[in-house]
């Protein structure tokens, strides 16, 4: 299939590995609608505060590669892959502001995609910061 799986974890430099892949012209796919650990960034998502990972937005900011939000939505004929408009993370006076604005754009994109059928979206991890 041509898929390379990169497993992250403590002691591994996953960010640099992914950065190198992007710079060399490879596409990467990252789970971006939830932070699987508690180090995410708070962002408004469906009128609640959720924890999103900063990594995808930080990679885009560092490499200049756009983010293309996607979602798999179940239809009567099977699953359909939907692409939202690609976007570049905006440059602001500091990285934290750029990351926050990029995450807001990402969360808005996911809201539009998931609103096609919110019943298809699920998580077994806490998403909303109020759940922590």
Label the predicted regions.
Residues 12-132:
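Non-catalytic C-terminal accessory region of glycerolipid acyltransferases
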Residues 1-11:
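Membrane-interfacial amphipathic helices and adjacent loop/beta segments
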């Amino acid at each position: 299939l041509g898929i390379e799986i990169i497993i992250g974890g403590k002691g591994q430099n996953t960010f640099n590995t992914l950065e190198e892949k992007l710079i060399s012209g490879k596409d990467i796919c990252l789970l971006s609608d939830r932070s699987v650990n508690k180090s995410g960034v708070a962002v408004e998502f469906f009128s609640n505060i959720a924890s999103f990972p900063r990594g995808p937005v930080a990679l885009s900011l560092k490499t200049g590669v756009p983010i293309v939000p996607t979602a798999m939505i179940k239809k009567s004929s099977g699953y359909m892959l939907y692409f939202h408009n690609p976007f570049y993370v905006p440059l602001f006076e500091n990285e934290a502001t750029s990351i926050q604005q990029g995450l807001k754009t990402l969360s808005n994109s996911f809201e539009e995609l998931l609103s096609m059928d919110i019943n298809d979206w699920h998580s077994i991890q806490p998403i909303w910061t109020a759940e922590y």
